[in-house]
């Protein structure tokens, strides 16, 4: 297992904020307990993006929950990644799916779900939800069950 400080380039260093969508800032580190199934949850209450049509800002709380396997996302890199959506034009549903797919690519988790709780615009709230369970495992069935039993 590589030294933790060798795996991470952002933590403990001066922060450079990207001005547009930047999945390359995401960093992962080794899970010290890959034999255990356990949840990791991030609540990101200050997410912003832009409406791709009007350019108006959209505000949301993004909730990310996952069951790690070998890799885990480093929280400062996640913060910078989410911040990179600030000037990015995407619909709410796109943001949630993009975030989930980027995290799957980074970590290959056993299971992940991402929820966006967007502030109402025009009197309508949008709460997109996306999830993934690793194919061929109990987590695939878990993902289907959680998706089909959402409110």
From Swiss-Prot:
EC code: 1.7.1.13
Keywords in alphabetical order: Cytoplasm, NADP, Oxidoreductase, Queuosine biosynthesis
Protein residues bound to substrate: 73-75, 92-93
Cell compartments where the protein resides: Cytoplasm
Any Gene Ontology biological process: queuosine biosynthetic process
Pathway listed: tRNA modification; tRNA-queuosine biosynthesis
Reactions that this protein is recorded to catalyse: 7-aminomethyl-7-carbaguanine + 2 NADP(+) = 7-cyano-7-deazaguanine + 2 NADPH + 3 H(+)
Family of this protein: Belongs to the GTP cyclohydrolase I family. QueF type 1 subfamily.
Protein name per UniProt: NADPH-dependent 7-cyano-7-deazaguanine reductase
Gene, per the UniProt record: queF
């Amino acid at each position: 297992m590589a030294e933790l400080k060798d795996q991470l380039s952002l933590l403990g260093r001066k922060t450079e904020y990207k001005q547009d969508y930047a999945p390359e800032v995401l960093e992962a580190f080794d899970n010290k307990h890959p034999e255990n199934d356990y949840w990791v949850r991030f609540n990101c209450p200050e997410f912003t993006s832009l409406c791709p049509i009007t350019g108006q800002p959209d505000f949301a709380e993004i909730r990310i929950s996952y069951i790690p396997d070998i890799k885990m996302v480093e929280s400062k890199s996640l913060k910078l990644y989410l911040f990179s959506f600030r000037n990015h034009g995407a619909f709410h549903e796109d943001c949630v799916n993009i975030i989930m797919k980027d995290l799957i690519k980074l970590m290959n988790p056993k299971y992940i779900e991402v929820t966006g709780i967007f502030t109402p615009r025009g009197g309508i709230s949008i709460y997109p939800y996306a999830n993934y369970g690793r194919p061929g495992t109990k987590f695939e069935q878990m993902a289907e069950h959680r998706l089909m039993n959402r409110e």
